[in-house]
Amino acid sequence: LLTDGMVVVGVEYRLSPHVKTMEIVDDAAAAVAWVFDNIGKYGGDTSSIYIAGHSAGGYLVDMVGLDKKLLARYGKDADKLAGIIPFSGQVITHFETRNQRGLKPLQPTIDETAPLYHVRNDCAPILILSGDREKELYGRYEESAYFYRLFKLLGHPDVTLYELGGF
């Protein structure tokens, strides 16, 4: 990718059960803020920052890109992202959060820790990727489709849902 003029930053974050879900989300926000502050040193451009992640990473990029308070803590504006690319990210309250609260694994919940709670029509362009609806983790495609539909209903100008074959 570097030969194509792209800089890729892979980040680490603390894991459950050692920390709560929102601490993990804050780790992701801190990492994105670091990218804004430092990408120029590596040949990157702050106007071309895309955030992407798979599964838990998909959840994290949704939260960081949609809940403006997360990056604002670090003096950054989530609307300055060039794009958000979640792949198979959970958009209801994360199962780990539900587990921490003693809820049943399949009990759907939507609160301030859920990307669905923060859907808005003025965020960065968003490309929602999902695996095959018949093979994807339980309910994940349906969550992604609902997420997409809410963006459309709110009038987001640049949202795409793409279902990958297989998986």
Regions of interest found by a model, annotated:
Residues 1-10:
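Short amphipathic alpha-helix adjacent to the substrate-entry channel of hydrolases
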Residues 9-11, 87, 162:
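The conserved SAM/SAH-binding core of class I Rossmann-like methyltransferase domains
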Residues 13-17, 91:
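Alpha/beta-hydrolase active-site loop signature
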Residues 16-18, 164-167:
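Histidine-bearing beta->alpha loop at or near hydrolase active sites
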Residues 75-97, 106-145, 149, 153:
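The feature captures the conserved acid-bearing segment of alpha/beta-hydrolase catalytic domains
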Residues 148-166:
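Catalytic histidine neighborhood in serine/cysteine hydrolases
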